[in-house]
Amino acid sequence: MQLPVEVVNGALGAFPVTIAALAVFAMIGFAGWRLSFALRDATNIPESSILVAQAIAGIALSFFAITFSSDPYAYVIFARAHGVFRLNPYIFFGPIGIIRDTVLHQCLAFYGDPPPSDVYGPLWTIVEGIIGRLETASSLWLQFWTQRVFAVAGAVACTAGVLRLLANAAPAARRFGASLFAFHPLVLWESAIGGHNDFLMLACAVWAFATVDAYPILAGILLGCAIGIKFVPVLLVPVLVARVIRTSDVANGLMCGALALGVPLATFAPFWTGTATLLPLLTAEARLGISPTWLLNIPFLARGITNLPIAAGMHGSYLASLSWGHLFQYVLDLAVLAVVISVTVAVARGASLRTVWRIVTAFIWTLPSVNSWYVIWLMPAVAFGDAWGTYAWWFGALAALHYAVDSGAVGGVSGAVAWAASITVVFMGLPIVIALGARRRPGAQHEQAHAG
C-alpha cells in the first residue's frame, strides 16, 4: 500500500530528491534570516506578528509532498492502537495486522507487523489516543497532516515561550531573537514537514523555565508535561529545582520537582503491565547512527569487539556480561551526569538558566545516533545572541546534511561510510569552529539578550 506522503528513507535513486530538498531548506534558511533582520528593525509591528507569520509559514509547509522521517506514521499507529482498539502500544509483542483497519494496514505495510512499540512519554500516548478516537473515520493523509499541524502549534508555542524568556531584553533584541528561532530552517522543516512531537515537548520545557521564577508550581507541572511527552527533559529537573530553591524556598523547590516527576509517573500508570512495559523504552536509543559516538566506536566495530565482553574469563561476574560497546556508552552517560551536576550547582549558586545549553549539548553529543530533529532541543539558544546562539544556529542549519544519510543518497555511492563520517564531522564540528571564530573576531559586537 502506498503512503499518502512519501517517506524518502533508505530509498534507491534518492540523490536528486535530496539535492532538491536541501535547496528548499537553504532557501527557507535565507528567507528566515532576512525576515529576522526585517522584524528586528520593524518597531511598528507587534511581536504577535512573529507568531502569526510562523504559523502561516508552518501551515503552508505542512502540505509538503515528501518527508525524510516516518515518525508521524508511527504516531498514527499508536493513536489508533490505543484510542480506537484499546491496545497497549508499549507492548506490541505480536502482530496487530489481524485487525481489519485500512489505516493501520497502510502504516504496517511500511513498518512491518508487529510495528515498533511506543517509545514516547505516556502523556503523549494518551493525547494521541484521544486524537485517534476523534479521527476514527478519517483518511491516513488527514491523520498524518494532523501530526504536522500539532508540531507547528508546538513550535509556535515555543516561540511564545522564547519571547517570555526575553522579556527583559531590548525590544529589538527580543524580536530578533524570537524571529531567529521561529524562522530557523530546521524549526520550520522538522515541525511542518517532519511533524515531530519534540516541539510540544520543547514548548512545555521552554515555558517551564519562562515561568519558574513567578510560578514555580506551574513550572513543575509544565516540565512534567514535557517529560510526559518525551523523557529527555528529566535531565533538567535538578536544575529547575535548584532555581526554585534559590528564588523561592526549599518547600516550593521540592514540590516543583515532585510535580515534574509525578506527571509522567501518573500518566504511565494505565499502561503499566510489569517490567516488560519498560523494554522498548530501555532499548529506544541503542542503535548506532551517525554521531560522535559512532565515530568513536569505529575502531571497536572494525575489530569486531563491540559486543564482546570486556572480561570474558571472569565467569559469573558483571564484567563478563558487560560489552565494550556498553562500557563506552556508560562512560558517556557518566559524562552527561557530571554536566548535569555541575550546571545544577552553578544555578544553585546564581548562574543564569542559559547554562542548561551545556546539558542539552552534552546529551546530544553522547547519543548513539544524532537525528536531525534532536538538534531542535538546542534551537531556543539561537534567540540569546551569544556564542551559544551562533553555535546553535549553525548546528541546526548543518543538521540538514543528515537528510543525505536518511534518504539513502549517501548509501548509494561508493565509500558510503567515509561520506557518512565526513557529514558527521562537518555538521557536528563546524558549528563549533564558526562560533569560536565569531566570538574571537576583533571588534565583533554581539547583542546580548538578557534572560535570568
Regions of interest found by a model, annotated:
Residues 28-32, 151-155, 159, 168, ...:
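Aromatic/glycine/proline-enriched transmembrane-helix motif characteristic
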Residues 44-148, 152:
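Intramembrane catalytic core of multi-pass membrane enzymes that act on lipidic substrates
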Residues 44-52, 162-184, 203, 215:
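Transmembrane-helix signature of polytopic, membrane-embedded enzymes
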Residues 53-57, 248-272, 398:
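Hydrophobic alpha-helical membrane-interfacial segments at the cytosolic entry of transmembrane helices
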Residues 386-452:
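Aromatic-enriched
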Residues 178, 189-191, 207-208, 217-241, ...:
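Membrane-interface alpha helices of multi-pass inner-membrane proteins
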Residues 1-63, 348, 353-354, 435-441, ...:
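Start-transfer (signal-anchor) and selected internal transmembrane alpha helices
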Residues 157-161, 200-216, 341, 360:
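Specific aromatic-rich, kink-prone transmembrane helix
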